[in-house]
Amino acid sequence: MIIVFMKILRSIITYFNVLLFFLILIFFLFPFYLVCKIFLIERYVVRLSFIMMRACIKISLWLAGIKIIVTGSENIPKKSNVIIMGNHIAAMDPLIFIYTFACPFVILAKHSLLRIPFVNIVLIVMGVIFVNRRSIRSAAAAEVKAIKVMREGRSIGIFPEGTRNRGGDTRVFKKGSIKMALKTGTSILPVTLYNTNNFFIKNIIFNSGLSVYIHVHPLIDVLKLSEYEKENLTSIIRDQIVKKLETIKI
């Protein structure tokens, strides 16, 4: 009973911290973002938002008593931009990406998130690129935006499955992200996530004591790949991620 009470207490404190962050972002940074967008300098606000979000995530996870175990951090490049590509288990996955990678990057997310009040404002201020996969025009526009970001020297975070697998089998990776990497010559950083679907008890109470795992694989330089490797790169990356996932589960 005491353990349950402590988890509830931790959750309340954590939610208060998140609420404070939302208020700062919505009432201060969002208006500032709109002004900067007029002068085409919104990327500086996006960078600041990323830094604030990362700090909020780190503090919140500490308050909630959730441990993030990162392996392979030596594979994270210090300067060059990359496409961070991982398996998609749960809604918390993008937050774990932000927790792990200190250098600001742009996330590709599904268009339906724009319908969630307040969350949509946070995502907009963070420069998220929204994709409606049911619309060819929307997908093409998102690809153009992502390529522009990469050619500006910034990184992209993406989940090639396109939707959450909720801890089940890793879905087949879509080829769009691979095509963007090959088109721009941007290196790919594969990432394996595990246990992100167990963040909450009854969908609201933080699961204190939980350990979440993220493994960063060696960087893939697409410019050095053979034609065969380029043709099969989607399967190669998925197999690499799934293989690591199986060893973590043991």
Swiss-Prot record:
This is 1-acyl-sn-glycerol-3-phosphate acyltransferase. Belongs to the 1-acyl-sn-glycerol-3-phosphate acyltransferase family. The HXXXXD motif is essential for acyltransferase activity and may constitute the binding site for the phosphate moiety of the glycerol-3-phosphate. It holds the Pfam family Acyltransferase. CDD domains: LPLAT_AGPAT-like. Converts lysophosphatidic acid (LPA) into phosphatidic acid by incorporating acyl moiety at the 2 position. It comes from the Bacteria.
